[in-house]
Structures are given as structure tokens and as C-alpha cells.
């Protein structure tokens, strides 16, 4: 339950300004398993001591897609006859609530990380940073599926053309395996050629995966 205001009046320049008290049922973040049905618990509003719920406008509810992992904001708002707007916000996390471990942290590429280009030429690289952010249970965001390859080449004074970082959401399973969603290269949605060997060892804090993008394959090993 969330309240967007702590009373029915505010005082400005010695004048009483009635406000809307928003009372959001349920939690500010609700986790829903992928494929499940989401039923919004809703929000009520009180204005000058009277029920004002029928004046609430809801934005974002229709955008919630439980088949696509991610975070979906829902906004509830009410406007008084005087034109003052009050609101409350909820986030629906489409994730895997069964996952109890956390996979967030700053990771370094480790031995075994390499790029194999379309011609079979291998290039190892280590000690580049990859950030993993925990969004919800079993749902994280990784800032570069390529393991910071282009940043590593730049640091080694071997800059290459077409530098790209690939961001993605990772939906984790209880056994540590995972799949990528909402994949973007430099902020634009893209398709990967392949993604495999994806595991996370919670006890050791080690990520591994193999990703192929535009014909080049990257074997990634990350240590936390």
C-alpha cells in the first residue's frame, strides 16, 4: 500500500489547498512470472474526505506484457477541479520470482574470454569490465554481452572499427542458466546470430556464455 500524500490539505501562502490522497493497493513493485497473468490491485483516491477513485486515470497497464521479461511502469493520476495533479507509480517486474540468488555486480573478463572472427582468427582479452544490474528476482541487465571487447582493444591501443556494446536483459533460471531478451547494440534493437553455454555459478560468482553477432563469436568468462 502506498500513499502519495499525508493529508487532505496543504498550506501555501496562508491558503488551504485541498489535495488528493492516493492509496495504492499492493506493493510499489510487483513481480510476475513470465507467462503468468497480471491482475493489477489498483489504486483509490480521496479528495476533501470523499471517494475520488472514479477520477483516476491509469497509464501503462495495457503495456504490461507478461511474455516479455522486463520492467513495466504503471502510473495512477488524479486532477482536482483546481487543476492540481497527484499521482502514484507502480512497477511490474516480469521475471522469475523463484530465483533467490543475486547475480549483480561489477565483473572482469577472465582467462578463456576470446573473440573468434568469421575467418576463424582468435583474439583473447581479459580484465575488461562488465556491469550486471539486478532489476528483480531472476532478472538482470548486462551492459555488454561482448564482454567489453571494444573497450579492451582501445585500452590495448588496438582500436577497431565499428565499436559496439550490446546491452541485454538476462532471465535467470534457478539452476543458473539464462537467456537474453531486449537485446540492443548501441541502444538499437538487434538480433543475435546465436547464444549458448550460458551459466552463472552463484557460489563462485562466475558468468559464462557464448554469443555470435554478425558472424563473430565471443566466448565470455566473467569473475566477480
What are these regions (language model features)?
Residues 1-28:
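Bacterial Sec-dependent N-terminal signal peptides
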Residues 7-10, 89-97:
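A domain-level signal for the structural core that forms small-molecule/cofactor-binding pockets
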Residues 16-19, 94-102:
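Extracellular interdomain linker/stem segments of modular secreted and single-pass surface proteins
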Residues 18-50:
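Solvent-exposed, low-complexity, repeat-rich "mucin-like" stalks and linkers
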Residues 21, 42, 73-75, 206-210, ...:
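Beta-strand secondary-structure signal
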Residues 23, 31, 77, 91-95, ...:
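Generic structural detector for well-ordered beta-strands
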Residues 49-88, 94-95:
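Serine/threonine-rich, repeat-prone extracellular segments and beta-strand-based repeat modules
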Residues 98-224:
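Ser/Thr/Gly/Pro-rich, low-complexity flexible regions
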